[in-house]
Amino acid sequence: MSPALQDLSQPEGLKKTLRDEINAILQKRIMVLDGGMGTMIQREKLNEEHFRGQEFKDHARPLKGNNDILSITQPDVIYQIHKEYLLAGADIIETNTFSSTSIAQADYGLEHLAYRMNMCSAGVARKAAEEVTLQTGIKRFVAGALGPTNKTLSVSPSVERPDYRNITFDELVEAYQEQAKGLLDGGVDILLIETIFDTANAKAALFALQNLFEEKYAPRPIFISGTIVDKSGRTLSGQTGEGFVISVSHGEPLCIGLNCALGAAEMRPFIEIIGKCTTAYVLCYPNAGLPNTFGDYDETPSMMAKHLKDFAMDGLVNIVGGCCGSTPDHIREIAEAVKNCKPRVPPATAFEGHMLLSGLEPFRIGPYTNFVNIGERCNVAGSRKFAKLIMAGNYEEALCVAKVQVEMGAQVLDVNMDDGMLDGPSAMTRFCNLIASEPDIAKVPLCIDSSNFAVIEAGLKCCQGKCIVNSISLKEGEDDFLEKARKIKKYGAAMVVMAFDEEGQATETDTKIRVCTRAYHLLVKKLGFNPNDIIFDPNILTIGTGMEEHNLYAINFIHATKVIKETLPGARISGGLSNLSFSFRGMEAIREAMHGVFLYHAIKSGMDMGIVNAGNLPVYDDIHKELLQLCEDLIWNKDPEATEKLLRYAQTQGTGGKKVIQTDEWRNGPVEERLEYALVKGIEKHIIEDTEEARLNQKKYPRPLNIIEGPLMNGMKIVGDLFGAGKMFLPQVIKSARVMKKAVGHLIPFMEKEREETRVLNGTVEEEDPYQGTIVLATVKGDVHDIGKNIVGVVLGCNNFRVIDLGVMTPCDKILKAALDHKADIIGLSGLITPSLDEMIFVAKEMERLAIRIPLLIGGATTSKTHTAVKIAPRYSAPVIHVLDASKSVVVCSQLLDENLKDEYFEEIMEEYEDIRQDHYESLKERRYLPLSQARKSGFQMDWLSEPHPVKPTFIGTQVFEDYDLQKLVDYIDWKPFFDVWQLRGKYPNRGFPKIFNDKTVGGEARKVYDDAHNMLNTLISQKKLRARGVVGFWPAQSIQDDIHLYAEAAVPQAAEPIATFYGLRQQAEKDSASTEPYYCLSDFIAPLHSGIRDYLGLFAVACFGVEELSKAYEDDGDDYSSIMVKALGDRLAEAFAEELHERVRRELWAYCGSEQLDVADLRRLRYKGIRPAPGYPSQPDHTEKLTMWRLADIEQSTGIRLTESLAMAPASAVSGLYFSNLKSKYFAVGKISKDQVEDYALRKNISVAEVEKWLGPILGYDTD
């Protein structure tokens, strides 16, 4: 029987009992939360009728997938799931109410049932908890789950309208209030606000709960769980973990933590951060690992339990459980793993004595924080420019004012919309919403500034961070003051209190102190307001007015500040600085000097922050001495003539300013500075003349080599340092390299002449080496991909390494010979395709055999740190290091060649790689695989007789496409991989194309590279410098078990021999016990031979020709940038060719989707029917299947695309694959396979097991060594 939830006679007792009871348990042990509800519901395989039940059998909309309705239509199913989790060891179960708000239920037309759904769900959970409590004698608790809803307050659903929102704060509060009522009436013990991807939504939920607790419901313990979406450590709306904690701490949660989106391993650093910044208990319920390529969760119960036990052993958690993909099996093992672990001990205080604010990022104001600049220019009353923009409705331009304030150093941004001609609440809402769309601005907290409390509330309802309210006062009496303060506390904001009471504005020192002291005690004693969230403004008033009574205003503020800080612990002091100098408006130099002097003294007395024009504050010591003394006299009232003297000073000094520096002013510097500037900025225009000028200075640079070793290398060192610090980007570095090559190219003839003269004179030439070291780079034998390698070469060259680039398809003996001939310090190997991994192992073995003891670097798309540590490093006794990308290569090479660092660095690498090997071998033991026979039985099943029969292609055989129109392909280019080549990656919310252009860090450079790409594309296409060729083919096909047999057009498959066979690999890694996913193989999507239904399979191969020749020409001309650009564009055109041709196949050539109407964005999201998997990729990882394609369609003869010995395609800008028309076909990853499938596959292909293991090495689920 559920407790009396609306019993108001003893609300404090109920609160105390529940909170204290849970608190007592948490102090003794780690509690366990349940696992995924959706995961378990999927296991039940419920259909539409189950979801509808009898009550909703005639409902107008489909209900399948609306899991929450099952608490009404299938309560026994939900009850049983709850009970399984409880018996598995869960102390707390969550109600089945993740989407039980009227907002989320509107999608199903059931918004009117929100209250009932919550009450029923709570009742079902309550029944299960009480039954298991009686059964086991261990008290179980029910947490009412309040999900995030499917709408967000911080992100616009419209790209074109960043200020638009499809939900309001008040609507969310109403929805959460209705949901919470149902949960409370149904008997929950805890209210859990979970899976928070937008903190503003969570703040609305907290507001709703507080409303209920104030009305009639006894308070319940509140748990809050956020969701960090990726390794950036931010929520979907862009807030950091600490920012999130600060934003919701006003809700006084008993527990706070994270769930969903990440697995335990990925979640750990963010749980650690949260634990360090909260005094609440910490809860953690991650997913069962990260979702794989197809959305499944692969982490086994034991793996997940191990991770969470590590959390517990390290004192990070108080409550653990599971989210997506987790089951009672996971919870059972987790409960067992943590049962003897000590719980985390929450700190007694977190950032004691600090004012904690947040925008997207946290901002802490502590005892040692310097003066805080609150940007003043976003104020219609204080900035004519801003007011003009807002009045004209030009909010986007007004946003630039805010951005400049932040860039100039504002740590908090004041926003004021108080003007009689404005709709204040609407203007505040629109502008705050726009700020939320700009991460560079939204990272700082806002100060919502208005004399109209309705405007203040409008602003608070838009902000996910913790704001400052500016301001309230005792002007209208205590009741009004306390009512507003109570609301501010409920919104979770700090606030400014003006020194203003019923008698008016405080101007004298004693009055300021008295008013502020009275307000402080009202807030702290009556409302329990955190003293650290109180800011007093003792009124900065105007001086220099000519009125004697105003002369002491500055002194009174400074003296009052000192006393307030000494007597009111925790409180801060702020003020509006521009008021001080209002008498001197129009004289900006005077005003700024007055502000600088005033702040110098006010800060000494304890002023913490001020509303200032960030960036326009002079340093006290930098103010002209005469002006400084005049300001001192005025502020301290030392001279009755101070105002007049300041005015006279302004008239004699004028209002001039510095001239704007002209663009080419750098040309006026010495030649060394010009050379360095040109290198850093990538400016080619003057490089030859400047290099020649330096060469002609024989006194300073007697030899051409001196110029290289001096100003040129100095410039490139700056480039390298900036790149390493993330202040320069790859395209810029490559442009710098292009300038360097031109300069060196100019000097080479002079150096060769000098060398020849020395040889004639002395008979020999002493070689001099200005480089840090020599590095041999090569793409290994059989592989033709080299963009990444070339970029690494350029970056290393920019950092004073000599790079010997051997190109592509480089055999081992050539690599080793070059290393010996050039006395290389390091060898770097690159590869894109999986067979290249074996070639890298071979090179390492040969280096060991020949006793070549120099470091070996491994890189390329197919490589990984794990493969390097497990498969390559053990074969070679010198350092073997995996290098992720160009930006890491310089650091690695520098440490390997530093005599003082290299030994220690190598030891660290050896230890790290040994740990990786141990983890790898342990994971092999933990992985479980279905026997192949069982995996086949659990494969994807289709009712071929009832499904629509396969469509016959418009032709059988092949069709070749010569000289394909490149212009048609431009719109199909996917630009994201293009930017990846240049290592340009935007941060949330500016990831991907075209949003990357908005990114503050890389956006400008991305736009330049994109423009360069389009210019080059236009040239390549208009001048026909590239050619595209391809082939498409179709044949009758039938599946037999895991293989696909192809037949001649006239053949009867049941009686004929196949003309070709494509061999398939099937998923074997055991899936979660709750998963209903089949174990896929590509053959599942082709009609079986025994079905009697005729099916078809297609194939294609396309390529862009001429890329290598153009790239080489650019390289020979010293233009690395264009060399890399043309290769990147060649790859994009080839992929675009594959995309466009597949569209034609679906609509015309095979015509199984003749009416398809998809745009390019839809194609990228894979919204088309059918698939085009490629051999060597996840759905069929075996590259040898290409041999069958090439033979069947005579691809090399018809297109010129050939296969290397490692089965890479040449040219490198090529794509090939198979076409499946089955409307239910999907992309999947085969994943790891076990030995029985390898043996079976070898037998079917009639090759040795060893040969199969060679080609399938990366997906083997066992160790072959």
Curated annotation (Swiss-Prot):
Cofactor: methylcob(III)alamin; Zn(2+)
EC number(s) stated in the UniProt entry for this protein: 2.1.1.13
Tissue: Widely expressed. Expressed at the highest levels in pancreas, heart, brain, skeletal muscle and placenta. Expressed at lower levels in lung, liver and kidney.
Binding site for (6S)-5,6,7,8-tetrahydrofolate: 382-384, 449, 470, 537, 579, 585, 591
Metabolic or biological pathway, per its Swiss-Prot or TrEMBL entry: Amino-acid biosynthesis; L-methionine biosynthesis via de novo pathway; L-methionine from L-homocysteine (MetH route): step 1/1
Keywords carried by this UniProt record: Amino-acid biosynthesis, Cobalamin, Cobalt, Cytoplasm, Disease variant, Metal-binding, Methionine biosynthesis, Methyltransferase, Phosphoprotein, Repeat, S-adenosyl-L-methionine, Transferase, Zinc
Protein name: Methionine synthase
Gene that this polypeptide is encoded by: MTR
